[in-house]
């Protein structure tokens, strides 16, 4: 069986990091890239990297949500923060102030009276900011869709990045939604250019 590493010895931690899924396949092309990086390190003492990817990677590990619990979905959101699911392991730490958060989780039925408050809190969040709509009521009105006092989806008030379906969605569904948001952040550039 042929080794996936170019040398016969067991890889060091640094070598193993180079051979992840996004790396070049082993071969002359990869060796040329590695020689170029090694030469640049020897000449300058540093490597020029893509700042946008680095910042997006850092943001995915430190999402600070502003929890906007409006109804029964908020109970499932609380479950996601408890020891069984422990969102802290993903770097997701809830904040009480919108000025310190970059993600808003809208969980539950949004009424017409609450909609201006939701928009005000969203506007107070610093850029870049993301919104997760959690539950059928936040996604499209849910069970109360035809009520005169219910907004038929929070995406009519704020732009939504991830929709978590369910009535109420499970804590696992919220964790999956947060992981999908992390993927979205990694894929898109978020550094504002003037």
From Swiss-Prot:
It is a peripheral membrane protein. It catalyses: a quinone + NADH + 5 H(+)(in) = a quinol + NAD(+) + 4 H(+)(out). SUPFAM superfamilies: HydA/Nqo6-like (SSF56770). Its EC number is 7.1.1.-. Keywords: 4Fe-4S, Cell inner membrane, Cell membrane, Iron, Iron-sulfur, Membrane, Metal-binding, NAD, Quinone, Translocase, Transport, Ubiquinone. Pfam families: Oxidored_q6. Belongs to the complex I 20 kDa subunit family. One of its GO terms (biological process) is aerobic respiration. Binds 1 [4Fe-4S] cluster. The keyword Transport applies. This is NADH-quinone oxidoreductase subunit B. GO terms for cellular component: plasma membrane; respiratory chain complex I. Its cofactor is [4Fe-4S] cluster. It comes from Granulibacter bethesdensis (strain ATCC BAA-1260 / CGDNIH1). NDH-1 shuttles electrons from NADH, via FMN and iron-sulfur (Fe-S) centers, to quinones in the respiratory chain. Couples the redox reaction to proton translocation (for every two electrons transferred, four hydrogen ions are translocated across the cytoplasmic membrane), and thus conserves the redox energy in a proton gradient. NDH-1 is composed of 14 different subunits. Subunits NuoB, C, D, E, F, and G constitute the peripheral sector of the complex. [4Fe-4S] cluster binds at residues 72-73, 137, 167. InterPro entries: NADH_UbQ_OxRdtase-like_20kDa, NADH_UQ_OxRdtase_20Kd_su. The keyword Cell inner membrane applies. It is found in: Cell inner membrane. Gene3D superfamilies: 3.40.50.12280. One of its GO terms (molecular function) is 4 iron, 4 sulfur cluster binding. It is an enzyme of class 7 (translocase).
């Amino acid at each position: 069986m042929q080794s996936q590493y170019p040398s016969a010895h067991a890889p060091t931690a640094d070598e193993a990091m180079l051979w992840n899924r996004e790396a070049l396949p082993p071969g002359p092309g990869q060796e040329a890239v590695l020689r170029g990086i090694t030469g640049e390190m020897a000449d300058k003492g540093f490597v020029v990297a893509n700042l946008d990817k680095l910042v997006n990677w850092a943001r995915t590990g430190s999402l600070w949500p502003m929890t906007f619990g409006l109804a029964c979905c908020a109970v499932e959101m609380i479950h996601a923060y408890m020891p069984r699911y422990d969102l802290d392991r993903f770097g997701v730490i809830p904040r009480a102030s919108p000025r310190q958060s970059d993600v808003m989780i809208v969980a539950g039925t949004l009424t017409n009276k609450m909609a201006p408050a939701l928009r005000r809190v969203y506007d107070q969040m610093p850029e870049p900011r993301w919104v997760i709509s959690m539950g059928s009521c936040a996604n499209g009105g849910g069970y109360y869709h035809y009520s005169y006092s219910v907004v038929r989806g929070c995406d009519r008030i704020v732009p939504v990045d991830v929709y978590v379906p369910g009535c109420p969605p499970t804590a696992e569904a919220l964790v999956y939604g947060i992981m999908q948001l992390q993927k979205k952040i990694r894929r898109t550039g978020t550094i504002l250019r003037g």
